[in-house]
C-alpha cells in the first residue's frame, strides 16, 4: 500500500537541516543523457521545491548544453551527498524546462518568482557570455550590469525535476531505502517504499 505524501522528503529535509552549516550542502550533481548517448554531468544548486509539490527547482542558462540534452531526452538523475550525516539521495525523474517562450502564464509567473528569489549576483551570470563558448579578452574585461528590479532575462530557465524514483542510502546506519511513484486510478501520485540491502 502506498502513500500520497513523498516519504523520502522528510529524510531529505532532515539531511538538509543537519548539514545546513556546510556551504556546499545545497550543491547537487545533475546527470543528463548527452546528444551522443553518453552521460553528461554537472553540479547545480538546489533551489527548493515547487509549492505544494515534490518537484525540485533548479536554475540554469538557456544557452547551456543541458537544455539541448533535456529537450532531446527529458530524463535525468540527481545525486546529492551530505558529508556530515553520510547520506546519499539519488533522485530520478523527468525534467520540465520553463523558459521565456512557455505559453503557460502560470509557469511564466513561477519562473519570475524563482528569478527574484536569487541574489543579484546569481542573476548576473545570465547576462554573461554564452557558457562553454571561447573566451576573448574583450569579454572578460567588460562589466555586466543588470537592473535589480527587472524581470527574468531570456537566457534564464527554471528546471523542474519531477521525482519518479528515489534511492536513499545512509552510510552511518547502513540503511538503504528505495522509493518509487506510480499513478493511482484517479491520476494522483502514490509512493511506495522498500528496504533494500546497501
UniProtKB/Swiss-Prot annotation:
Pathway(s) served: Cofactor metabolism; pyridoxal 5'-phosphate salvage; pyridoxal 5'-phosphate from pyridoxamine 5'-phosphate: step 1/1; Cofactor metabolism; pyridoxal 5'-phosphate salvage; pyridoxal 5'-phosphate from pyridoxine 5'-phosphate: step 1/1
Domain of life, per lineage: Eukaryota
Top enzyme category: oxidoreductase
EC number: 1.4.3.5
Record carries keyword Oxidoreductase: yes
Family in the record: Belongs to the pyridoxamine 5'-phosphate oxidase family.
Subunit structure: Homodimer.
Protein name: Pyridoxine/pyridoxamine 5'-phosphate oxidase 2
Organism encoding this protein: Arabidopsis thaliana
Phylogenetic classification of the source organism: Eukaryota, Viridiplantae, Streptophyta, Embryophyta, Tracheophyta
Amino acid at each position: 500500500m502506498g502513500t500520497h505524501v513523498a516519504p523520502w522528503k522528510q529524510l531529505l529535509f532532515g539531511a538538509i537541516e543537519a548539514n545546513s552549516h556546510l556551504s556546499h550542502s545545497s550543491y547537487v550533481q545533475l546527470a543528463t543523457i548527452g546528444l551522443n548517448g553518453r552521460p553528461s554531468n554537472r553540479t547545480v544548486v538546489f533551489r527548493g521545491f515547487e509549492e505544494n509539490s515534490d518537484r525540485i527547482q533548479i536554475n540554469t542558462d538557456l544557452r547551456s548544453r543541458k537544455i539541448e540534452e533535456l529537450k532531446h531526452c527529458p530524463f535525468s538523475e540527481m545525486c546529492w551527498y551530505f558529508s556530515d550525516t553520510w547520506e546519499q539521495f539519488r533522485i530520478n525523474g523527468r525534467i520540465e524546462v520553463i523558459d521565456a517562450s512557455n505559453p503557460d502564464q502560470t509557469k511564466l509567473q513561477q519562473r519570475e518568482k524563482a528569478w527574484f528569489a536569487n541574489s543579484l549576483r546569481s542573476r548576473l551570470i545570465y547576462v554573461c557570455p554564452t557558457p562553454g563558448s571561447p573566451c576573448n579578452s574583450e569579454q572578460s574585461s567588460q562589466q555586466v550590469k543588470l537592473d535589480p528590479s527587472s524581470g527574468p532575462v531570456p537566457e534564464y530557465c527554471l528546471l523542474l525535476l519531477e521525482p519518479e524514483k528515489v534511492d536513499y542510502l545512509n552510510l552511518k546506519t547502513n540503511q538503504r531505502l528505495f522509493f518509487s511513484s506510480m499513478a493511482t486510478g484517479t491520476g494522483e501520485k502514490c509512493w511506495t517504499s522498500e528496504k533494500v540491502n546497501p
